[in-house]
Amino acid sequence: MRMMKNNNNETVMVIGIDHGYGNMKTATRCFPSGVARYDKEPIFQNNLLVYNGVYYQIGEEHKEFCAEKTQDEDYYVLTLAAIAKELDGKGMNRAKVHIAAGLPLTWVATQKEDFQKYLLQNEIVDFTFHNKEYHVEFAGADIYPQGFAAAFYRLQDFKGINMLVDIGNGTMNIMYINNSRPLEKKCFTEKYGTHQCVLAVRESLLKELGTVVDDLVIEQVIRTGTADIGEKYLAVIRKAARDYTKEIFHKLREREYNPELMRLYVVGGGGCMIQNFGEYDKSRVTIVRDICATAKGYEAMTVRKIQRNGGMLI
């Protein structure tokens, strides 16, 4: 979160938010993209958000993949939670907020306007999160291409031909950046993220061992390469993850990836799959492990935009 004066001399808080299918990320926070709605006050209130008289448990249940993030209220409620977490980190509960967010590369052109309207559906919002009251006024919202934002800070490193791949929970975004310039005509979005890997692993476990393993265990193995479970289960999970990672590289080759002719930059939560289970030349592949990199990029781009329009950091 960055505090700025805009060209109207108003104090605004620029907050970058990465609306992932697995996790919501800001520049400093990460939490599961789950929302459970209750009409009555629930018993457990660890992550309770109250908005418009409705109770929401944040981080509960799994957010299913949806081609349009505006199709229900979940991402709006998650946005309020993300804003609250950033404000709370600075000891604040009232602010005028300018959101910096994004969409998958090939969705930006068709969905940008609708997502912007969705995020700005209310000029002023009052809600409660973690038993703390918040008052938020919205100053604006900018929508950027997902993936590219994570590379914003290091564009100077992209000399020659480069492929950038952002592996999220629900999608994999591919972009070419040549001599620090993104190529708009060479941007692709595949429905091939870490959640699909979890599904593939789950199927392998059921087929080979006749066992259902909790997704939390599978996700831990994908993220770290291991877990405190029996070796036979670990072996099946690792093999399925390796097979899935091979398929990722196959899809990259379908988009003309050649490790001898270009460098590969991997961002997003799925980078751990490449690191733990991929076969690649480490001198030609860079894995950015900062899961908040995209949110930081969104934030930086909006800061630059406001500065160009006469605003300043304070």
List each model region and its residues.
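Nucleotide/phosphate-binding catalytic cleft detector across ATP-hydrolyzing
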Residues: 1-164, 181-196, 208, 216-314
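Conserved blade-register residue in beta-propeller folds
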Residues: 26, 174-176
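Ser/Thr-glycine-rich phosphate-binding loops at phosphate-binding pockets of nucleotides
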Residues: 167-173
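Acidic, metal/cofactor-coordinating or nucleic-acid-engaging core segments within structured domains
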Residues: 202-208
